[in-house]
Amino acid sequence: MTQEPQPKFINRKIDKKGLGKLISWAFSHYGTARTALLADNLKNLGFRFATRGAVSISVEDLQVPDSKVNILETAEREIQRAEERFTRGEITEVERFQKVIDTWAGATQELTEGVKENFQERNPLNSVGMMAFSGARGNLSQVRQLVGMRGLMANPQGEIIDLPIKANFREGLNVTEYIISSYGARKGLVDTALRTADSGYLTRRLVDVSQDVIVREEDCTTQRGIFLGSLRDGDKMIVSLEERLVGRVAGRDVVHPVTGEVLAPRNTQFDYDSAARIARSGVDAVMVRSPLTCEANRSVCRMCYGWSLAHSHLVDIGEAVGIIAAQSIGEPGTQLTMRTFHTGGVFTGEVAKPLKAPFDGKIKFSSALKARPMRTRHGDDAYQADQAGTMSLEGSDGKKETVTITPGSLLLVRDGQRIEAGTMYAELALVGKTARKSTEKAQKEVFSDLAGEIKFADLVPEVKTDRQGNETQYASRLGLLWVLSGEVYNLPPGAETSLERGGKVEQGGVIAETRLVTEHGGGVRLKEQDAKGGREVEIITASVMLDKAIVHEEKSQGREHYSLETDNGQVFALKVSPGTKVNNGQVVAERVDDRYMTKSGGLIKYSEGVEVAKARGKQGYEVLKGGTLLWIPEETHEVNKDISLLEVEDGQYVEAGVQVVKDIYCLTSGVVAIAQRNDILREVVIKPGELHLLDAPSDLKVAHESFAYPGTEVIPGVVTTDLRYVEQVETPEGLAVLLRPVEEFPVPDEPDAPSQEASQQAGSSIRLRGMQRIPYRDGDRVKAIDGIELLKTQLVLEITDQAAQLAADIEFVPDEKDPSMVRLQLVILETLLIRRDVAADLLHGSTLTHILVKDGERIGPGAIIARTEILAKQAGTVRGISRVGQTVRRILLVTQSDLVNVPVEGTLTVKPGDLLRAGDKLAKDFASPESGQVVLAESGRVVVRIGRPYLVSGGAILLVVDGDLIQRGDNLALLVFERAKTGDIIQGLPRVEELLEGRKPKEMCVLVERPGKVQITQMPDESYQVSVVEDDGGVTNYPIIGQSLVVVDGQQVQTGESITDGPSNPHDILRIFTAREGLQKGIESVQRYLVNEVQQVYRSQGVEIHDKHIEIIVRQMTSKVRVEDGGDTTFLPGELVELRQIEQVNEAMAVTGGAPADCTPVLLGITKASLNTDSFISAASFQETTRVLTEAAIEGKSDWLRGLKENVIIGRLIPAGTGFNAYEEAEEVIEDDELIDDTLGLRTVGVAFAGDDDFVEEEDED
């Protein structure tokens, strides 16, 4: 404890920050008990006065600053000006948008200042003000929304909506504002939900990787350490040296840079005072001890860790610093933003510092200042400084102010210009490694506000062809694209026009007409108009009717079934229903016929003379020539059960009704054949027939599996009486012959087809053809128990000739003589739709249709059915006809409403064809009221055709060509622009995760491998070739793909510096520095990079985390190396080993003269590191349990129970805090022979542990 200081008397207004400082001061000087008392007293004081003060919020407390009206008016004037410049074509769409966003951002900022001033100056005791400024509730940005304005919001895609919410919650929002406002609110909610999940998982991984880091030693006596300086981003201080030193231990003596006096000897602990003293002395960097360089075994020592931040003293032995580190990094995770808003334009506060004139005066540039003209992002003309120099502002009364201009700064004034106070005259570009502007390419569409014709004024289109051969038009430089107003008619496909350019059209006159033409011709059927006023015309190309057959309808199970009865009594089942379409070759009906039904499954054989062809679409075989089908019945049971359930033997003769397999009975008598595989019974076949035993195989006089005709002697004494199929079988009684019965089914050559009459249009014919199909081929075995149908007779639609691709419609037609009888008719229709007449709308004129045919008329192919005319909405002159190939697609009429008549006196300064902007002079005192093109200029009047100029920036993609006709809202061009990315694209949690998981960043920068001088060559296709001429004369080329450079030609670069923008890849840093400066340096540089990067993310969100927490995690990530070559050691190539372990083994090798192991450092992400820890219990409880345990079992691993997690899992006391000593004592009790030495000299405790519980009890007794 420091000597007791004098109590301080603090008498001032105190806010949240001040309160924190007060408590912290009390704590470090007076300890816990007295601080607690102080806090208690403060609480009572606070409550007492809060109760008396009765601070509450009423609507009256929400005071809107008076300056709001003026601020909004100014902003709206600026925006109005930008809109006017945009309409005149002086700035592009992007520049307008940027200007709007920046103006509103500025206004919001100014208003926030106004709110602050209003509360602090005019009304310091306002409840809302007191709450916000004291830090009790709310903050300035929330108060701004209550009494200032809500400001700009982003849409769900993250683009800023250029309509700000001007109202605040005190005034209330209107409907539009309310909806825009809800966008942002919803995003906030969704983000928070995602954040908590992400951050929880991050914490879990961190705890797992660091849970075994415990302070186990007093001092590891290492001479190494890390250099701490202040962490800055450009000119902005992120963490000061003083802040970083507190709670650290000096790694070597700290010496005053001027006097040489030792400010702090080695191993000094820095407290607030000594840290402040060192920072004041001007020391740039101090070497401190750090967990990163601690040489304690698998832990850290007290000196390297430094203070335990909980009580500002050196950390105690046995403290679980790993878990503390993990929680310190994980907990603020929720406060980090998930993703950056992708904000179209980013406020430039980040990358440029605006300079405003403090007084009126005249600008002077120094001679060194070199600047070139350029266009700002608001479309103003300005200069950009190429070389540094100074610029001074000289006031009339001798005042003078000089500023240093950095390269890349914007100068908004000219040399010698006079400016007024408050004018912004420059934007200084910040210099510094981290202040680099990273930009990305983005596109913005330009839509036309009016319909009309495109005219390129000074645009020079340039065509680029990519590798696929697609051509794209680009604007080669800044230029104007005009849209000259007119009425554009979109013509439907196939429309023809007789108009020519310059032709006149009256209102209601015909612009174009389309014709409806029949392709095949035939009989006409006119349908009634439908609800929408359209009509269908059907043309019957061909039809066929079954004139003698009657259609019967039956209903079953709620569905209709149709059958067809012919005059000779055959019945066909219809396979189609009325109103459906049938294609060529499709089956229309199938005969209902049981002559070809079998009683069971069996074998099918074709007799001589049957000829078949494969039918369409896997539908069996079509009979070409008739004959007889031979059918050998057999009964097949598919079983698929265990063989033990079989009740009969292979080859046994069974009677009908016998159980062959459990619960399966045969329906016929016959010989059993069994198919089995792997003791699974597949099927049981029963083959009926006469069974005769054979004495010798030679007795069989007929070939096996052939037919025996009636009267054939099969074996001596057996003669067949009818046709049989002969099979030789093995029975339990011996060899036998089975004579199987054969059924014969005759097949006619041609099936009966019902009579039909057809009406055909020349060239296409249609009929129904009878067809016989056999589903099986010769020799097929049909597995079935019930019967099957061997032959199907079908009616098939046949369409011949050119109409084969058409489909026929099914119709049921009442008979002419007897309407109660219904006949089947198939027709081929050509259906033509006649559109209803439409009134004119924005894109089309009105249409009028005439039908030119009558119902029932017969017409030839190519006849015109109807004609549709497109009529003009207004009278006008044809000015443009846009064609695609030969067909006209759009027609432009210029009507009276597109022209402006301007009476003018005096001499005209314009001639026909000139393009004017609104406000340009027509004659001396006469300005044009509209932008456009002069059509007529005669004495006394000028006629201007209204137009609208659009400024297109160089490099923009043009989507129209000169002379195109476009409708309103068509896309004219894509402006390509670069927008600044705020800091880094990935911010917040995802970035922390990316760093800690050691992932390669998406758009990573290119790093310099060896120091040297940069040479940049520009290629013809605008890309760069960067090479570094190294100090030893070697040259390395670096490929740059689509990234912007951050170095300039001739710049000297060091190892590991970045050439392009974007985040670095930590693996590259490790590789480059290891190759250049050795293992230790490589590991150190990547450790430094990771610690600083993680700190930057947290600091940018205003979260303070001490470096040492991040260092512990990074230490765990970099503690392993990969063995490349094991040398004479026991290590295997590719193995991941602790660096310490390899160093110790290599020291031993140096003594014995063996070859040392060779290794490269690896950076493991936290997940990988957790899974690679020595403790398999810890790794298995984290992820991939099965894999970890299986591998541990195969390798025969032991778990040394060093960490907390392993011990918790198996239910022992954890080796931290008071449990730490139990270990030390436990190890002393054990006899030497029970110790097993491990390579690291860490002792494992065998099972003969002197009972953990005893120690706990002994301690209790003390």
Curated annotation (Swiss-Prot):
<keyword id="KW-0240">DNA-directed RNA polymerase</keyword>
<comment type="subunit">
    <text>In cyanobacteria the RNAP catalytic core is composed of 2 alpha, 1 beta, 1 beta', 1 gamma and 1 omega subunit. When a sigma factor is associated with the core the holoenzyme is formed, which can initiate transcription.</text>
</comment>
<protein>
    <recommendedName>
        <fullName>DNA-directed RNA polymerase subunit beta'</fullName>
        <ecNumber>2.7.7.6</ecNumber>
    </recommendedName>
</protein>
<dbReference type="GO" id="GO:0006351">
    <property type="term" value="P:DNA-templated transcription"/>
</dbReference>
<feature type="binding site">
    <location>
        <position position="304"/>
    </location>
    <ligand>
        <name>Zn(2+)</name>
    </ligand>
</feature>
<dbReference type="GO" id="GO:0008270">
    <property type="term" value="F:zinc ion binding"/>
</dbReference>
<dbReference type="InterPro" id="IPR045867">
    <property type="entry name" value="DNA-dir_RpoC_beta_prime"/>
</dbReference>
<dbReference type="InterPro" id="IPR007066">
    <property type="entry name" value="RNA_pol_Rpb1_3"/>
</dbReference>
<dbReference type="GO" id="GO:0000428">
    <property type="term" value="C:DNA-directed RNA polymerase complex"/>
</dbReference>
<keyword id="KW-0808">Transferase</keyword>
<dbReference type="InterPro" id="IPR038120">
    <property type="entry name" value="Rpb1_funnel_sf"/>
</dbReference>
<dbReference type="GO" id="GO:0003677">
    <property type="term" value="F:DNA binding"/>
</dbReference>
<dbReference type="Pfam" id="PF04998">
    <property type="entry name" value="RNA_pol_Rpb1_5"/>
</dbReference>
<keyword id="KW-0548">Nucleotidyltransferase</keyword>
<keyword id="KW-0479">Metal-binding</keyword>
<dbReference type="InterPro" id="IPR007081">
    <property type="entry name" value="RNA_pol_Rpb1_5"/>
</dbReference>
<dbReference type="InterPro" id="IPR007083">
    <property type="entry name" value="RNA_pol_Rpb1_4"/>
</dbReference>
<keyword id="KW-0862">Zinc</keyword>
<feature type="binding site">
    <location>
        <position position="294"/>
    </location>
    <ligand>
        <name>Zn(2+)</name>
    </ligand>
</feature>
<keyword id="KW-0804">Transcription</keyword>
<dbReference type="InterPro" id="IPR012756">
    <property type="entry name" value="DNA-dir_RpoC2_beta_pp"/>
</dbReference>
<dbReference type="InterPro" id="IPR042102">
    <property type="entry name" value="RNA_pol_Rpb1_3_sf"/>
</dbReference>
<feature type="binding site">
    <location>
        <position position="220"/>
    </location>
    <ligand>
        <name>Zn(2+)</name>
    </ligand>
</feature>
<comment type="similarity">
    <text>Belongs to the RNA polymerase beta' chain family. RpoC2 subfamily.</text>
</comment>
<dbReference type="Pfam" id="PF04983">
    <property type="entry name" value="RNA_pol_Rpb1_3"/>
</dbReference>
<dbReference type="GO" id="GO:0003899">
    <property type="term" value="F:DNA-directed RNA polymerase activity"/>
</dbReference>
<dbReference type="Pfam" id="PF05000">
    <property type="entry name" value="RNA_pol_Rpb1_4"/>
</dbReference>
<comment type="function">
    <text>DNA-dependent RNA polymerase catalyzes the transcription of DNA into RNA using the four ribonucleoside triphosphates as substrates.</text>
</comment>
<feature type="binding site">
    <location>
        <position position="301"/>
    </location>
    <ligand>
        <name>Zn(2+)</name>
    </ligand>
</feature>
